[in-house]
């Protein structure tokens, strides 16, 4: 097989991942409302794809054109467009199918032409009272630069006013930042039906009431449209500008960045479409996509369940971790033994409670934390402010370049700085993606450090839907190295050595290679050798080549890859010892885990880093060993449960076919539910053991 056939283009692999999301919307075993929400997730993902992946390839084409390079990127862009258009068609078909399915459940999503007289009267009243104050049309005159005000990823209604042979055009922003997108119509007596109308359709219904009295026209029509801009921005690195100022300017650039996608209602007249493309400076490298009458489907992530409970997933309430029970405070519990939390199965309240306790504990001297993404109304962040008020030294490393969270992080930076928190904006040229917390307490004559090392963000909301591991430890070797990471962030030019943590960009590549090479050596020596890897994305060619080498040497490799995967499994003599699955279900799989067999003494690591060049070589990431045998086995058990999933697991192959793992006649295993049950049993057994220990202690007194 030629070398180029050993790597799948990451952009095409990403589209294959989003196809797996669309499979969830198509799966009739998924509750109906959840299927509709998966349409929203698919749409949100695709928006980001165009902002980032598509825009990056388009940028490469323009660079190659200037430099006289080859047209490889053009070919890739064409394949991306073809695949995206196919997925959009599948999406439209699924949407129509689900609308009919909802109607069978007596839930009706109606447009403005389907209202009866009573509903029509109510909707018009709602429009005048709630909607009209938020509607201001923008007339598209010849002298107006649409690019200066058209918002990225907002849905608009493009209005055509015709008077004889003359046309005027206008744009109306659908004000979903001010009003709900889904409006529930009042129930009518004697009718057991729920009726929902989109805000878009309320505006369509009342177009005449917006323009009447200001413009003369014979006909008035509205068509849906949306534009996606390039999400990249250039930062000025002049000395006189702080990173905060640079980022603020960068966000302003994004607001007026060039378009990469224009989605329009397919019934839009040709003359109107040409006019809009001219005004929006749409090039032939951009994606022009005809669609239905609704855009910004990402709002469907929050589609309301107005029907029966069974139309949604059964709740899986987060459980409390028994390792914290029986102690006066969280620090005593962590000092007694390492604690592993697994969100969303465990409650994130354990983390917010730890920081809350630290904020007023008289023994706590300092708190250090790095923030990548946090909730808008974060209790954890408010506790950091409380800690400063209580005289603690608080250092917060804020990553201002967390994509699409930049604005929120800038705002939190200002709030924290105003409160007296020492805010650091990180290392120039490198994102800080590690998930670290360090709390220092004065216990007697000693300073004792407590560390958190995780795979996911300190984000209360996403911790309810993202699966992640969080290690809490009072191991002073690990805690000292977490402290060293913060020192490296504050002074990246000072030499630092890590003996226990694996830290990007210092030693991640060499240490991961060392771990994989050890398995290769064991396989060549005739010993059992195995690697288990779980990441979101695997696209780094150096790491892929090392895995190919391990497979060729006889190392058995199992992988769970949620998103992009450039490695091609099943190639004879190259990757025939590699098995890859991907799991898409109600929770988003987010942990990064590496397990090496190590000649029968497994080594287990959790990490913040995906296996991408940027994460390994150009970001600050932390990979931590799990020392506690009990916790090592727990992680291995959880991974093993995922590898026997017969409901939500798909095989990753070179054709990107997304075939479900063969189900056969075996008992169905849905791994996320099985993991919940497994952890529930772990907590039950822990409480039972604690109760037995308490009984023994009482009887010995």
Swiss-Prot record:
Residues 428-462, 585-615 form the PLD phosphodiesterase domain. Keywords: ATP-binding, Kinase, Magnesium, Metal-binding, Nucleotide-binding, Phosphoprotein, Repeat, Transferase. One of its GO terms (cellular component) is membrane. GO terms for molecular function: ATP binding; metal ion binding; polyphosphate kinase activity. Mg(2+) binds at residues 373, 403. Its EC number is 2.7.4.1. ATP binds at residues 45, 466, 562, 590. GO terms for biological process: polyphosphate biosynthetic process. An intermediate of this reaction is the autophosphorylated ppk in which a phosphate is covalently linked to a histidine residue through a N-P bond. It comes from the Bacteria. It catalyses: [phosphate](n) + ATP = [phosphate](n+1) + ADP. NCBIfam families: poly_P_kin, PRK05443.1-1. Catalyzes the reversible transfer of the terminal phosphate of ATP to form a long-chain polyphosphate (polyP). Belongs to the polyphosphate kinase 1 (PPK1) family. This is Polyphosphate kinase. It comes from Vibrio cholerae serotype O1 (strain ATCC 39315 / El Tor Inaba N16961). The lineage of its organism: Bacteria, Pseudomonadati, Pseudomonadota, Gammaproteobacteria, Vibrionales.
């Amino acid at each position: 097989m030629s070398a180029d056939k050993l790597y799948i283009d990451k952009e095409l692999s990403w589209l294959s991942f989003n196809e797996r999301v669309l499979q969830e919307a198509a799966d009739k075993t998924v509750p109906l409302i959840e299927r509709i929400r998966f349409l929203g997730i698919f749409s949100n993902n695709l928006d980001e794809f165009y902002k980032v992946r598509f825009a990056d390839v388009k940028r490469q084409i323009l660079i190659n054109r200037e430099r006289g390079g080859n047209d490889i990127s053009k070919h890739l862009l064409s394949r991306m467009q073809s695949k995206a258009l196919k997925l959009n068609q599948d999406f439209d078909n699924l949407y129509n199918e689900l609308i009919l399915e909802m109607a069978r459940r007596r839930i009706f999503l109606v447009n403005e032409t389907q209202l009866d007289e009573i509903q029509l009267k109510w909707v018009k009243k709602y429009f005048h009272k709630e909607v009209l104050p938020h509607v201001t049309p923008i007339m598209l005159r010849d002298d107006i630069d649409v690019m200066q005000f058209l918002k990225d990823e907002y849905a608009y209604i493009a209005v055509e006013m015709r008077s004889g042979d003359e046309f005027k055009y206008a744009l109306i922003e659908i004000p979903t930042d001010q009003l709900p997108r889904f409006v529930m119509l009042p129930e009518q007596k004697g009718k057991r039906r729920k009726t929902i109308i989109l805000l878009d359709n309320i505006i369509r219904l009342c177009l005449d009431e917006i323009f009447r009295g200001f413009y003369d026209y014979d006909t008035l029509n509205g068509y849906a449209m949306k534009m996606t801009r390039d999400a990249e921005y250039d930062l000025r690195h002049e000395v006189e500008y702080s990173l905060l100022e640079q980022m603020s300017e960068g966000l302003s650039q994004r607001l007026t960045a060039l378009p990469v996608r224009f989605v329009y209602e397919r019934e839009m007249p040709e003359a109107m479409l040409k006019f809009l493309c001219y005004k929006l400076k749409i090039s032939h490298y951009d994606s022009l996509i005809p669609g239905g009458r609704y855009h910004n489907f990402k709002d469907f992530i929050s589609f309301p369940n107005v029907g029966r409970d069974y139309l949604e997933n059964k709740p899986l309430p987060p459980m409390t971790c028994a390792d914290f029970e029986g102690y006066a405070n969280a620090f005593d519990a962590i000092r007694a033994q390492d604690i592993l939390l697994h969100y969303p199965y465990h409650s994130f309240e354990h983390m917010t409670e730890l920081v809350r306790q630290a904020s007023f504990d008289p023994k706590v001297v300092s708190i250090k934390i790095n923030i990548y993404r946090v909730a808008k109304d974060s209790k954890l962040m408010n506790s950091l402010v409380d800690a400063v008020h209580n005289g603690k030294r608080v250092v917060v490393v804020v990553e201002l370049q967390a994509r699409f969270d930049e604005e929120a992080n800038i705002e939190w930076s200002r709030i924290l700085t105003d409160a007296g928190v020492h805010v650091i904006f990180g290392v120039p040229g490198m994102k800080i993606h590690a998930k670290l917390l360090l709390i220092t307490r004065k216990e007697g004559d000693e300073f004792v450090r407590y560390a958190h090392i995780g795979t996911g963000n300190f984000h209360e909301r996403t911790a309810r839907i993202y699966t992640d591991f969080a290690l809490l430890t009072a191991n002073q070797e690990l805690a000292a190295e977490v402290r060293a990471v913060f020192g490296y962030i504050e002074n990246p030019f000072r030499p630092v050595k890590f003996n226990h943590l694996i830290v990007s960009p210092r030693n991640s590549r060499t240490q991961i290679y060392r771990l994989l090479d050890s398995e290769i050596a064991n396989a060549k020596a005739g010993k059992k050798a195995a690697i288990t890897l779980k990441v979101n994305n695997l696209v780094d060619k150096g790491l892929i080549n090392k895995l190919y080498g391990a497979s060729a040497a006889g190392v058995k490799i199992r992988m769970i890859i949620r998103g992009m995967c450039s490695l091609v499994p099943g190639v004879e003599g190259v990757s025939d010892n590699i098995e890859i699955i991907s799991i898409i279900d109600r929770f988003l799989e987010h942990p990064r885990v590496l397990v090496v067999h190590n000649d029968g003494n497994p080594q287990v690591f959790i990490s913040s880093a995906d296996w991408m060049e940027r994460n390994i070589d150009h970001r600050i990431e932390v990979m931590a060993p799990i020392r506690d045998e009990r916790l090592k086995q727990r992680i291995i058990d959880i991974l093993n449960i995922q590898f026997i999933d017969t409901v939500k697991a798909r095989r990753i192959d070179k054709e990107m076919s997304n075939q479900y793992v063969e189900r056969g006649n075996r008992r169905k295993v849905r791994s996320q539910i099985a993991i919940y049950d497994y952890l529930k049993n772990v907590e039950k057994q822990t409480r039972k053991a604690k109760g037995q220990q308490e009984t023994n202690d009482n009887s010995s007194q």
